[in-house]
Each structure stands twice: as structure tokens, then as C-alpha cells.
Amino acid sequence: YYEEIGSTNDEAFRLGVQGAPEGTALIAESQSAGKGRLQRTWHSPPGANIYTSVILRPRFEPDLAPRISLAAGVAVAETLDPYCPGKVSLKWPNDVQIGGKKVCGILTQMKTATGVIDFVVVGIGVNVNWNLKEFPEDIQKMATSLSVEAGREVSRLELIILLYENLAKCYRELSQNGFAPLRKKWLDRTTMIGKPVSVTFGKETISGE
């Protein structure tokens, strides 16, 4: 537990390199350098949200590692469901939304050794009791918090316990039963099916549905 840290993912990665065991979890009250995908900043004010990273050491091939991020998305969605039934959805590849607005981001980082996974860090940031007026202007129209959508303040302790339980359950299911069961859960929640999408590889952009 950290009152303040640069980034829980950075610290978890450092601990992973040092040999920290699977299941090691870090949580912080605030981050001064929270990280999102594509080198974006994850806004991390103190005392309102959840910022956590978990170290996993899966026993499957590196090219299957992206499944961990999708499993984490399912775990987060199942955690938020009791607070906003029927409103939680998943947007490829790492966003959890409530009512079409982002409430959680997931960032996974992997270290490999001789063609196998050494460890994976799963970073999760959830907007919990963040007032919309406090959101940075550039994300106010696209982001929300659990308390705003639920209409009440949410116990972060209760939420983080439930999150860790669901994350452990989904990771165990992925490890023991493969991706198929989680894939169905993810597809049942995704907002992307049938929607126009564009994917950019360097200078090439591919569009489709």
C-alpha cells in the first residue's frame, strides 16, 4: 500500500523483475505519473479512486498474453455490475464503460524470458468517488465515475475486495479452462460488434465492422 506513488505499474514491474510472487498486489491512494495506453496519462487524484496493479506469472505462450487483459475487463465489469446493473459494457481493447462513458482503464505489461512469459503486470484504474466537476476538461464528456452512475458514494474497500476476488476467479478460469468461457462473457458485454472500426498499423489503416 502506498499513499502516493509514481505509477503502480512501474513499481509492480520493478518488483516482478526482482522475483515477486504471483498474486502480489499494489494499491495506491494517488499516482503522480499514472499510465494509460499509448503513453497517455491516467489522471490519479488522491482519495477518490482505485489504482492497483497485480503481478501474474501465467504458464502459457506470450502470444496468448492479451487474453489476460480481456479477462481483467470481465473481472472489472462483474465487480461494477452490482452497483449499476445492466449498464456496464466493455470497449476494445481495455476500457470498461457505464452508460457509454469510461469508468475504468486496464493496462497490461509483460516481460518475457527465452520465449516464455516471465510475468505480466495488470494495472487497473477505476473512477470510484470522483465528482464530475473535478474531471480534467479534456475527459469530462467521455468519462464518468461509479458514484455518479450509481447515485451514491461507494466504499472503496468493499469495491477493491470484490475486484480482487473477481480478478482471481477470472484468471483461474482462464488458466484452467482456456479462453472460450471468458470470450463469451466478453462478447456478451462488448459495444464493438457491428460498429465501424479502424485499425492503424504504421502508415496503413484498415477499416471494417
Tell me the role of every PLM-derived stretch.
Residues Y1-P82, K102-C104, V154:
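N-terminal lobe of the biotin/lipoate ligase/transferase fold
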Residues E3, L90-W92:
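Short loop/edge segments at beta-strand edges and connector loops
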Residues L70-V88, I98-E209:
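Long, positively charged amphipathic alpha-helical accessory segments at protein N-termini or as interdomain linkers
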Residues D95:
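Conserved active-site carboxylates
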